[in-house]
Amino acid sequence: MDASKSKALEAALSQIDRQFGKGTVMRLGDKGREKMPAISTGSLGLDVALGIGGLPKGRIVEIYGPESSGKTTLTLQVIAEAQRQGGTCAFVDAEHALDPVYAEKLGVNVDDLIISQPDNGEQALEVADMLVRSGAVDVLVVDSVAALTPKAEIEGDMGDHHVGLQARLMSQALRKITGNIKNANCLAIFINQIRMKIGVMFGNPETTTGGNALKFYSSVRLDIRRIGSVKEGDEVVGSDTRVKVVKNKVAPPFKQAEFQILYGQGINRLGEIVDFGVKLGLIDKAGAWYSYNGDKIGQGKANAMQYLRDNKEVAEFLEQKIKAELLGDIKPVAKEGAEVEEESAEQE
């Protein structure tokens, strides 16, 4: 850049700082490159698929899928993880269907959870915006976008046509709330439902409710599906679940994770530790037997999981080791007083 252009640019930058405040505009290189802060999803595989170890703070996330696919369960696990880190969480229950007993079973501290059950969509989004602007909320969940009914629709008669009301409501709210979410460094999760587009002959007929605004404003979009049942004998005790990262602005997208959701327990994290441990060679598998550090820890996956359940320090060590291997930037915890050297991505 020649001297005259450089001088004009500096004059413009100083005028902007005087008029709008320091830091309004800056060079991207002036701000130190920091790792994107994230909150774990409760699933080791999904944390790895997201590329940053969880869902990004200061961003909007959309989780959508069919009924009974695990959308609310996944968000409750995120809330539980955030609370363990000392965070404050809020749940805007537009569906009026949150079960505190189930939430508590998943590890949520229901006494500290802020909950709102609004009367209409405008109230729900206004409450959400006020909570975000307080700067004190780390995770905000809206369950669900489909239940954000505009006031005009509630006050109208059954059968009245209200074309595009909900889409306009979401578009206006997201324009207003996005900047506040970034400034407050709050993770905002919108749960959404699936609808079918009429008359689609080719391609995917599925779409989400509330218009297109949420698709654009979301930094991460997760498509969650139930793909099978977990059985103990003839009894169904959980669901096999697949989550696809269909949009990701903070890491490479289109990855997917598969895990089990056990009824009354949540995501089967120990099962994931066993599977990833075997895949990375941290746990040895010979036939049905699993071994760790040369010692047999169980015959069959269920017994190996029980060993980890009884030996929490081993489970924690393996989890941190797996994260260090797959994410490359998280230091493993020391085991039994021994220093564990961090393995970088280049050494893999």
UniProtKB/Swiss-Prot annotation:
One GO BP: DNA recombination
Matching SUPFAM superfamilies: P-loop containing nucleoside triphosphate hydrolases, RecA protein, C-terminal domain
The keyword Aminoacyl-tRNA synthetase is assigned to this record: no
Taxonomic lineage of the native organism: Bacteria, Pseudomonadati, Pseudomonadota, Gammaproteobacteria, Cellvibrionales
Gene Ontology MF terms: ATP binding; ATP hydrolysis activity; ATP-dependent DNA damage sensor activity; damaged DNA binding; single-stranded DNA binding
SMART domains with a match to the protein in the record: AAA (SM00382)
Function: Can catalyze the hydrolysis of ATP in the presence of single-stranded DNA, the ATP-dependent uptake of single-stranded DNA by duplex DNA, and the ATP-dependent hybridization of homologous single-stranded DNAs. It interacts with LexA causing its activation and leading to its autocatalytic cleavage.
UniProt family annotation: Belongs to the RecA family.
Secretion signal, residue range per the UniProt entry: none
Protein name per Swiss-Prot or TrEMBL: Protein RecA
InterPro entries: AAA+_ATPase (IPR003593), DNA_recomb/repair_RecA (IPR013765), DNA_recomb/repair_RecA_CS (IPR020584), P-loop_NTPase (IPR027417), RecA-like_C (IPR049261), RecA-like_N (IPR049428), RecA_ATP-bd (IPR020588), RecA_C_sf (IPR023400)
Binding locations of ATP: 65-72
Main location: cytoplasm
PROSITE patterns: RECA_1 (PS00321), RECA_2 (PS50162), RECA_3 (PS50163)
Cellular component GO terms, alphabetical: cytosol
Annotated localization: Cytoplasm
Gene3D superfamilies, sorted: P-loop containing nucleotide triphosphate hydrolases (3.40.50.300)
Keyword vocabulary terms for this entry: ATP-binding, Cytoplasm, DNA damage, DNA recombination, DNA repair, DNA-binding, Nucleotide-binding, SOS response
Top-rank taxon: Bacteria
Organism for this UniProt entry: Saccharophagus degradans (strain 2-40 / ATCC 43961 / DSM 17024)
